Amino acid sequence: NDIETFRTWIPFLLQQDIQVLTVHLRTRKEMSKVPAHYEYIDEIVKMRDEIAPDTLLQINGDIKTREEGLELVRQHPGVDGVMIGRGVFENPFAFEIMPTEHTLDETLALLRLQLDLYDEFTAEFGPMHFQKLKRFFKIYVRGFAYASDLRVALMDTNTTDEVRALLDEFDKQWEAKKAEDAVAIEAK
């Protein structure tokens, strides 16, 4: 758990003839409680260049958007790529080339896409625990009126079909509420 262990561990890994090395710039003990140790990136690049120059080097830690990742690569020549981990939990559109604000409809459409991909994956590879999918609901369902109520209802679902039905019902109620609010504004 000592951050300095990377000086022996990374050379060992690089000697294993690996194609890609992803370095999470924190110890297991630190997890995400402290900022990523970007100060070690150039030293890690140098190790890779000396020991296994053909191994691709990917960095992970505190990268929340594609642009932040590209900036990190620009600041540290020799880094071949980045991995966005928890950043996607703050922004499900973290990989966009041109970041933009998204509507609730777009965000819920992305949730529906994740449901479709989940169904495709389980059809090809067998059933997965639906509970694991539920941890992603908060990514999409937050920051708008009734988000908490919708999240609570989503957590009570047991299938992707139930989630879709709930989202469809929410869409109808949301549209009705927006229309009601528009009429109230016009009446003023």
What are these regions (language model features)?
Residues N1-E4:
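Active-site beta->alpha loop and helix N-cap motifs at the rims of alpha/beta catalytic domains
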Residues F6-V20, E39, E43-I59, I63-K188:
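Alpha/beta catalytic cores of nucleotide-metabolism and tRNA/nucleoside-modifying enzymes
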Residues H24-S32:
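Glycine-rich, proline-tolerant flexible connector loops at the mouths of alpha/beta enzymes
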Residues P35:
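Active-site loop ensemble at the mouth of alpha/beta enzyme cores that anchors a bound cofactor
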